[in-house]
């Protein structure tokens, strides 16, 4: 099957997907209630969609096409409210976060869907270990070549996305010392990491054809890249975000992506090059391990600086573009937390230090997802 044509989409439009945890309200471990939630959610007309995910203790929600991060929040809010209402009927809870803090992967069950069964047969235990929870942000691009240019420009900012969204410090009851341990599970898949540097759709199509001829790849879904083109939507899809603990942060992260995209389209600030990727894996590791306390290596100049400093400087650089997109409040929310060194991973660790019980941390995270201030 050849690479499909890149569809038209309005530049800088947004779409957001959130993978969410379903937990019981007894000990707050994961609960296999995806089918029941989907059945109840069908009764409420909502924007976007609600679908199953790899294992039956997960659910994915998504917005429709949005023109601003406030519209993203406007669509996520009724979906969240309907989820909470449905969960209450089932005596379960819904929460964000990139990993469940203490679930045991071997207890998971693959959701009964052909693609999930196929992936389970191919990847074995990795499929159950893939009970992790991410936010994906789609951004509309003017055309196929512009999409590839946008993709490789966004790649310099992967550490920003990781540190700002990091919410997975705990795995199987242990503090991993990572702010985003979730991405360590993605590394195990053979077609993860970065996309190849192709800046025209023709060159990308040639790469895709080579990969399909090997029999390794059948469609774009087989690539688990950090950012990948989504030709049927006319977007690129950024996939490194942990699912935040609140929909407000999820919408703000979408606003951050949109502001970057607006800056790229208006100012063309740099041309991507293969050498950008010399420090890609190192920067990615730093952000996963240390979050906002990471070191960032500038791919162009080679200089080292605190990642937090690079994020704040980037916010200053694109402030006028954020304002034009209606994303100033999103950047303000994120800036305040960056200046305080606060992300969701830190919040989870602070709660655990105080409570000394990860089940109680999950209970409080579920309250935060409901919209209650904690």
Curated annotation (Swiss-Prot):
Q: Which Pfam families match?
A: GCS2 (PF04107)
The reaction(s) annotated as catalysed by this protein in its Swiss-Prot or TrEMBL entry are: L-cysteine + L-glutamate + ATP = gamma-L-glutamyl-L-cysteine + ADP + phosphate + H(+)
Record InterPro entries: GCL_type2/YbdK_subfam, GCS2, Gln_synth/guanido_kin_cat_dom, YbdK
EC number, UniProt record: 6.3.2.2
Which GO BP terms apply? modified amino acid biosynthetic process
Organism superkingdom: Bacteria
What molecular functions are annotated in GO for this chain? ATP binding; glutamate-cysteine ligase activity
As for family, the record states: Belongs to the glutamate--cysteine ligase type 2 family. YbdK subfamily.
What role is this protein assigned?
ATP-dependent carboxylate-amine ligase which exhibits weak glutamate--cysteine ligase activity.
Q: What is this protein called?
A: Putative glutamate--cysteine ligase 2
